[in-house]
């Protein structure tokens, strides 16, 4: 049975916590995963590799993103792959 398909607002699906990173898995399949992350100011993920390309979309504030040796600032409403 397939799960119910319906639109949702990303902003309302994100949960925030003080001094934490909160993650919420939306889809997890062998072909890829969609996970929402909420970072409190100053929180970060350690450098890592992943089996799939990653799309980062900033829905609130801004984020410093490092891809290889390049660093980017991604702001509210922007995305980077």
Pin down the residues of each PLM region.
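Conserved short histidine dyad/triad with adjacent acidic residue
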Residues: 20, 35-50
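Glycine- and acidic-residue-biased ligand/ion/polar-headgroup-sensing regions
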Residues: 52-68
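Short, surface-exposed secondary-structure edge patches
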Residues: 36, 55, 70-72
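A short, N-terminal "cap"/entry segment at the start of jelly-roll beta-barrel domains
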Residues: 1-31
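Short acidic-glycine-tyrosine-enriched beta hairpin
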Residues: 69-81
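Conserved strand-loop elements at the edges of beta-sheets that form or border functional pockets
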Residues: 28, 39, 49, 57, ...
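Short hydrophobic/aromatic patches on the structural cores and recognition surfaces of FHA
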Residues: 42, 61-63, 77
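Active-site region of the double-stranded beta-helix
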Residues: 24-32, 45-47, 53, 59
């Amino acid at each position: 049975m397939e799960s119910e398909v319906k639109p949702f607002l990303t902003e309302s699906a994100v949960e925030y916590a003080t001094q934490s990173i909160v993650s919420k898995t939306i889809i997890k399949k062998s072909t890829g995963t969609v996970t929402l992350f909420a970072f409190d100011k100053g929180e970060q993920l350690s450098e890592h590799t992943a089996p799939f390309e990653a799309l980062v979309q900033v829905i609130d504030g801004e984020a410093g993103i490092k891809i290889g040796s390049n660093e980017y600032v991604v702001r509210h409403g922007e995305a980077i792959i």
